[in-house]
Amino acid sequence: MPNSLVYKKGIDLKKAPILMYGYGSYGSIIDASFRKTMLPLLNRGFIFCISHIRGGSEMGRQWYEDGKMFKKKNTFYDFIDSTKGLIQENIGDPKNIFALGGSAGGLLMGAIINYEPELYKGIISAVPFVDVLTTMSDESI
C-alpha cells in the first residue's frame, strides 16, 4: 500500500506513535506536502502517515474506480492494510496508533473502528459523512 511518512530526524521509529491520515474518496489526490499543523505532533515524536488508499486517484483512474460505490470497502481495507503494513515493517508503536479523517474520510474512520477496533488507540473523525441517506435527501445542501 502506498504511504507517505514524515517524522522528526533521530526518533526511534519502532517506538514512535503514529497518526494515520486517510481520505480515499472522489478521486482526490492527497499530496504529501508540508503541513505546519503537524509540527506539534512531529516535535513530540509522532510519525505522520498519509495512506494513499483506493478511492483517491494517486495511482490512476482504476485506483479511484476500485474504491467507490460497490467497491467502497476496498478503501476501508486498504487503510487497515496500510496500518498493518507499517507494523509488519517495524514502523511505529503498535499500541499507539491513531487515525484521522474528515468528511468522506470521516466515513473511513467509522468503518475502520468497526472493522478493527483493537488496531487503533484513538480515532479523529472530523465532520464525518456517515449518514449518507439523510444527507443526500436534504434539499437544503
Give the ranges of each region predicted by the language model.
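Cap/lid segment of the alpha/beta-hydrolase catalytic domain
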Residues: 1-98, 102-103, 115, 130-131, ...
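A conserved short beta-strand
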Residues: 118-131
